[in-house]
């Protein structure tokens, strides 16, 4: 996965240029910032910083973490991201903060987490947050005829896509599509105020840490 996103870094933002998704993107760009006003935010899988640029202007401060140095180089160059701190790191081994964060955001990351590691990831994330912190995840809905087709699931139930980059290389990428019930069940032991929001091509899920 790390190698795939490093190779894809320069062409990653092409996904935000798809004509049919522009209405959704404008709506989400307006919806997202209010979740992070005046908050100390940890962003997981910050990537090229596309979503960071909408969070940073309203947040108290943001730490954007990603496994790929190549994507973070692009993130640093965005106009609204000058004050953001960036860190190359592992989403499954998050650094302990000096002070717990007020909020966390994971955009287009949770769908890449293997089913067997979803609980592990969330518990690790929660350790970096204060009680009452808000967690927001944003990701893709599977839209027949528009989304990249899925291959057969593996023995654990994970699904995959075969993606081709501009250089012609092909990559088998884990891509799961959790539903509202799956997400609510996962966070029930430690989260409250769970909210699931959908647009035509995307979903968002929020919870507040107890």
PLM ranges: what are they?
Residues 138-189:
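C-terminal alpha-helical "lid/dimerization" subdomain adjacent to the S-adenosyl-L-methionine
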Residues 1-36, 39-45:
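Conserved class I S-adenosyl-L-methionine
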Residues 103-117:
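A short SAM/SAH-binding and catalytic strip from SAM-dependent methyltransferases
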Residues 96-104:
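A short acidic, Gly/Pro-enriched loop at the edge of an enzyme's catalytic core
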């Amino acid at each position: 996965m790390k190698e795939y996103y490093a190779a894809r870094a320069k062409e990653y933002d092409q996904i935000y240029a798809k004509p049919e998704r522009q209405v959704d993107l404008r709506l989400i760009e307006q919806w997202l910032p209010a979740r992070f006003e005046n908050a100390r935010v940890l962003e997981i899988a910050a990537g090229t910083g596309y979503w960071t640029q909408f969070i940073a202007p309203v947040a108290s401060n943001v730490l954007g973490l990603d496994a790929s140095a190549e994507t973070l180089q692009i993130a640093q160059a965005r106009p609204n991201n000058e004050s953001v701190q960036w860190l190359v790191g592992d989403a499954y081994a998050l650094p302990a903060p000096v002070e717990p964060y007020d909020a966390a955001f994971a955009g287009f990351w949770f769908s890449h987490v293997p089913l067997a590691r979803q609980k592990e990831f969330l518990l690790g994330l929660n350790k970096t947050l204060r009680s009452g912190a808000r967690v927001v995840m944003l990701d893709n809905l599977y839209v027949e005829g528009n989304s990249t087709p899925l291959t057969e699931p593996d023995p654990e139930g994970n699904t995959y896509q075969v993606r081709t980059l501009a250089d012609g290389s092909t990559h088998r990428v884990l891509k799961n599509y959790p539903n509202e019930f799956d997400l609510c069940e996962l966070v029930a032991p430690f989260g409250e105020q769970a909210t699931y929001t959908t647009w035509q091509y995307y979903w968002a899920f929020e919870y507040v840490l107890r």
